[in-house]
A protein has these predicted regions:
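Hydrophobic ligand-binding cavity/cleft-lining segments
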Residues: 1-41
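Beta-strand/loop substructures that line and gate deep hydrophobic ligand-binding cavities in soluble
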Residues: 81-134
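Hydrophobic/aromatic beta-strand elements that line small-molecule binding cavities or substrate pockets
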Residues: 6-8, 62-68, 91-98, 111
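A generic beta-sheet turn/junction motif
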Residues: 10, 57, 100-102
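A short, structured loop/turn motif at beta-sheet edges
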Residues: 14-15, 68-73, 96-106
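Glycine-rich portal/gate segments that line the openings of hydrophobic small-molecule binding cavities
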Residues: 28-29, 38-85, 134, 138-147
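A structural signal for well-ordered alpha-helical scaffolds and beta->alpha junctions
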Residues: 14, 59, 129-132
């Protein structure tokens, strides 16, 4: 099992960051890899069990399902249902924690998954860098932060 953990501190208050990240169907508004997003069957994006279909900039598609959501703890989990890349049993967790020194936000994004033998490092790099770190940089731009 591969485990990827990335985190960052954003120069924005937690309420503002949560407003953006909480929208399970809104990644296309800020993540550079996502061209379009829609929930299947018109399900609300904050309904546990809803499935989002993401079309990537390269034209490929994937499906993810929201499995937990907590406004109280400002976190959620989701799993990957269909993907063109070899990620199996993928479950990810996003959690925000207030940083009271300066009204900032700590963001943890982590996942566990399996992949084909010999591809563990490549898939960990893809998830950690091309998805998570790229997402951190993109959310900063979206929130108007200076990098």
């Amino acid at each position: 099992m591969v485990r990827v953990v990335r985190s960052t501190v954003l120069e924005s208050p937690i309420g503002r960051v949560w407003e953006v990240l909480r929208d399970f169907n809104g990644f296309d508004r800020w993540h550079p890899a996502i061209a379009a997003s829609e929930t299947e069957r018109g399900a609300p994006a904050d309904q546990v069990g809803c499935v989002r279909r993401l079309r990537l900039k390269d034209g490929s598609e994937l499906r993810e399902q929201l499995i937990t959501l907590s406004d109280l703890e400002q976190c959620y989990s989701y799993c990957l249902l269909d993907t063109p890349i070899p990620l199996f049993n993928y479950v990810a967790h996003i959690r925000l924690v207030p940083v009271t020194d300066g009204d900032r936000t700590f963001w943890s994004w982590q996942s566990r998954f399996t992949t084909r033998r010999g591809e563990e490092q490549a898939m960990a790099r893809l998830v950690g860098e091309d998805i998570y770190r790229a997402g951190f940089a993109a959310i900063r731009r979206h929130l108007g932060e200076v990098a």
